[in-house]
Amino acid sequence: MCWLRAWSHILLPVFLSVALIQLIFNLSDHKTKTHHHWKRKIEAKYVEKECAQKETCPVCTRDKRCIWCREEKVCKKYCFPYSDCKFNSIFWANCNVDLFGIVMLILIVILALAFLWYCLAYYFYMQQHMALYARHGQVPVYNWDAPGDW
């Protein structure tokens, strides 16, 4: 697992420097930040009105800023996780799979990737330890099920 340690020595300073640069930019640009804050508030009110005018699911979900609530049959502004609808009746970006289904699909993909990573890590771990056992005098058994007399 030396390659993992080597990559961590390379990537950790890179990530820390990116985080530090981002922090410096955020602290130094206070005027623009307050300007964007008010601009976002005005835009949010506009989006709420715009979403409320849409009356069907396909029209509502075309706009990525809106969600369709199946129970109330109304289009609302997308504000995850704060919504008046139940989680399994929210449709975002499509009218076929609700938001609960999308989140479950994402979790399944993450679990599958984690399992694949675990299998690869175990494979490399076993390869490394087989080489160590062979160097210390233990020879792996190749013909375990071979028939014949000794």
UniProtKB/Swiss-Prot annotation:
Highest taxon above the source species: Eukaryota
Entry's Gene Ontology cellular component terms: membrane
Signal sequence, renumbered to the chain: 1-19
TM region(s), chain numbering: 99-119
Topology within the bilayer: Single-pass type I membrane protein
UniProt KW keywords: Glycoprotein, Membrane, Signal, Transmembrane, Transmembrane helix
InterPro entries on file: PTTG1IP
Glycosylation: residue positions: 26
Compartment list: Membrane
Keyword Transmembrane found: yes
Parts of the chain on the Cytoplasmic side: 120-150
UniProt key word Transmembrane helix: yes
Topology, Extracellular side: 20-98
Protein name stated in the entry: PTTG1IP family member 2
The organism of origin for this protein: Mus musculus (Mouse)
Upper taxonomic lineage: Eukaryota, Metazoa, Chordata, Craniata, Vertebrata
